[in-house]
Curated annotation (Swiss-Prot):
Required cofactor(s): Zn(2+)
Single GO term (MF): metal ion binding
Gene name tied to this protein: rpmE
Protein name as annotated: Large ribosomal subunit protein bL31
NCBIfam families: L31, PRK00019.1
Keyword annotations of the record: Metal-binding, Ribonucleoprotein, Ribosomal protein, RNA-binding, rRNA-binding, Zinc
Cofactor: binding details: Binds 1 zinc ion per subunit.
A Pfam match: Ribosomal_L31
GO BP terms: translation
Protein species of origin: Saccharophagus degradans (strain 2-40 / ATCC 43961 / DSM 17024)
Top-level taxon of origin: Bacteria
Family classification: Belongs to the bacterial ribosomal protein bL31 family. Type A subfamily.
Length: 70
């Protein structure tokens, strides 16, 4: 096997836009900036908004559900 072909695996920081710093290890040599993390993402914070996404059948029933066939 060849010697020293593995990349360097060192410590790095991932800084979120909310100010949270995540310390991790990576082959990437520099610190990175991320947009969202588990501290500020709506799914993890519980502030997620649910949109009422009615489908095509709901729309059809709303338009034509009151009409009765003879």
């Amino acid at each position: 096997m060849q010697a020293d072909i593995q990349p360097n695996y060192g410590d790095m920081n991932a800084t979120c836009s909310c100010g949270n710093v995540v310390k991790t290890r990576s082959t990437l040599a520099k610190d990175i900036h991320i947009d969202v993390c588990s501290e500020c993402h709506p799914f993890y914070t519980g502030k997620q908004k649910t949109a009422d996404t009615g489908g095509r059948i709901d729309r059809f029933n709303k338009r034509f559900g009151a009409i009765k066939s003879k």
